[in-house]
Amino acid sequence: MVNVPKTKKTYCKSKECRKHTLHKVTQYKKGKDSLAAQGKRRYDRKQSGYGGQTKPVFHKKAKTTKKIVLRLQCQGCKHVSQHPIKRCKHFEIGGDKKGKGTSLF
């Protein structure tokens, strides 16, 4: 279980700041796929009509987790940077802090 605080003081690379400032931490989420992308248009055109599935469907999935990407937004200039961390099955932002010699459960 990885627990990350909601704010982090780290270096901001934007031209306005260029110093250590407080950043708001959120988790990166994949955006919605565009229907106008060239590959999607080509795929839809190929799929239309008779003939079933025209391209191979991938089944040999190897990974059980994804790498967590933190989205850091500077509270001074609103500049956003991304910071990948290790793979984990359980991830939370701003959860209860674990004290010394105690368990969360």
Curated annotation (Swiss-Prot):
One Pfam family named in its UniProt record: Ribosomal_L44
UniProt-listed Gene3D superfamilies: 3.10.450.80
SUPFAM superfamilies registered for this protein in UniProt: Zn-binding ribosomal proteins (SSF57829)
PROSITE patterns attached to this UniProt entry: RIBOSOMAL_L44E
Residue ranges of the region described as Disordered: 28-57
Swiss-Prot/TrEMBL keywords: Ribonucleoprotein, Ribosomal protein
Membership in a protein family: Belongs to the eukaryotic ribosomal protein eL42 family.
Protein name stated in the entry: Large ribosomal subunit protein eL42
Organism, as annotated: Gossypium hirsutum
Taxonomic placement: Eukaryota, Viridiplantae, Streptophyta, Embryophyta, Tracheophyta
GN (gene name): RPL44
